Amino acid sequence: MINLRKTHPLMKIINHSFIDLPAPSNISAWWNFGSLLGVCLIIQILTGFFLAMHYTSDTLTAFSSVAHICRDVNYGWLIRNLHANGASMFFMCLFLHVGRGIYYGSYLYKETWNIGVILLLTVMATAFVGYVLPWGQMSFWGATVITNLLSAIPYIGTTLAEWIWGGFAVDKATLTRFFAFHFILPFIVVALAIVHLLFLHETGSNNPSGINPDSDKIPFHPYYTIKDALGLAFLFLILLLLALFSPDSLGDPDNFSPANPLNTPPHIKPEWYFLFAYAILRSIPNKLGGVLALLASILILLIILLLHTANQRSMKFRPVSQTLFWILTANLITLTWIGGQPVEQPFIIIGQLASMLYFLLILVLMPLAGLFENYMLKPKW
């Protein structure tokens, strides 16, 4: 009998991508996050689909429709909690996935990396428009503050902001279009993820040592499907613990109040996964400067491969670069904390110092560390 898995046109693609794919024999648990992100995306699309059946994108009924989902729809509370906390899990996996890419030099696969950065931006846009939909206080004011940043663009800014709003302020038209965006963007994310995988399979996976693994490859199934299954078990465990025992711990209490344009919350802040970028935005007193710094904080990932100066790909055997990498990680955690604090001393100065250090580490210190390590590895005799 002919093996259908290897001959059928459609099954053949799946086989080459997930079953008979040659994978390096030494990839660690840090390589689990790609599959975890795929599962997170499927969870978000499925839970979002069921939420969309009951949600109404109208300013008068949006808030009560979310309350109706939680109170009256069968397992609506569970679907909503899985969707809200699934987004947090998605971003946790995303940040770890990007961190792994920086640590092990995966950015040198430039097509895969650049598509990945576009994916990150698309997922961030999806999460932002999704956060607006429950039409609570923080949803409304978050949308107002972030979309208002467009008005900082010279000459066309105000027109652009009003075009996005569909009026002179965030209102019914904004909510309706944000719901449309939130529905379509995940499918664009799926398409980009397929392109991301396509480019990855052109080169094959990187590995912790950073050297060419072609001489030692093993089939993806069963070795890495089993390994990914363990990661999945942990993902589901954490997600279910969050969704069932502490569903609102990562949300904002202000979002339990319906949106009120006449009452501004004392501290406007986005979800936790945007706080690092929000802290960088707030650390610059000038509006346009803040917007540019916010964009630069993410888009800097596109030029990271131009800043690679080391002769070795991975940081596994580069202690100076390793130290700077973990300082960068601590710095991002500090920025996340600062983003959630009020705009007052000492938080202002800490945020400004952390923002400066973020750009200094990536643009100056890490390339210099690479050059220093090259020099130290040269034979001196």
Curated annotation (Swiss-Prot):
Keywords: Electron transport, Heme, Iron, Membrane, Metal-binding, Mitochondrion, Mitochondrion inner membrane, Respiratory chain, Transmembrane, Transmembrane helix, Transport, Ubiquinone. Its main location: mitochondrion. The chain crosses the membrane at residues 33-53, 77-98, 113-133, 178-198, 226-246, 288-308, 320-340, 347-367. It comes from the Eukaryota. One of its GO terms (cellular component) is mitochondrial inner membrane. GO terms for molecular function: metal ion binding; ubiquinol-cytochrome-c reductase activity. Heme b b566 binds at H97, H196. The keyword Iron applies. InterPro entries: Cyt_b/b6_C, Cyt_b/b6_C_sf, Cyt_b/b6_N, Cytb/b6-like_sf, Cytochrome_b, Cytochrome_b_C_euk/bac, Cytochrome_b_N_euk/bac, Di-haem_cyt_TM. It is found in: Mitochondrion inner membrane. Gene3D superfamilies: Cytochrome Bc1 Complex, Chain C. Heme b b562 binds at H83, H182. Binds 2 heme b groups non-covalently. Belongs to the cytochrome b family. Component of the ubiquinol-cytochrome c reductase complex (complex III or cytochrome b-c1 complex) that is part of the mitochondrial respiratory chain. The b-c1 complex mediates electron transfer from ubiquinol to cytochrome c. Contributes to the generation of a proton gradient across the mitochondrial membrane that is then used for ATP synthesis. The cytochrome bc1 complex contains 11 subunits: 3 respiratory subunits (MT-CYB, CYC1 and UQCRFS1), 2 core proteins (UQCRC1 and UQCRC2) and 6 low-molecular weight proteins (UQCRH/QCR6, UQCRB/QCR7, UQCRQ/QCR8, UQCR10/QCR9, UQCR11/QCR10 and a cleavage product of UQCRFS1). This cytochrome bc1 complex then forms a dimer. This is Cytochrome b. It comes from Antechinus flavipes (Yellow-footed marsupial mouse). The gene is MT-CYB.
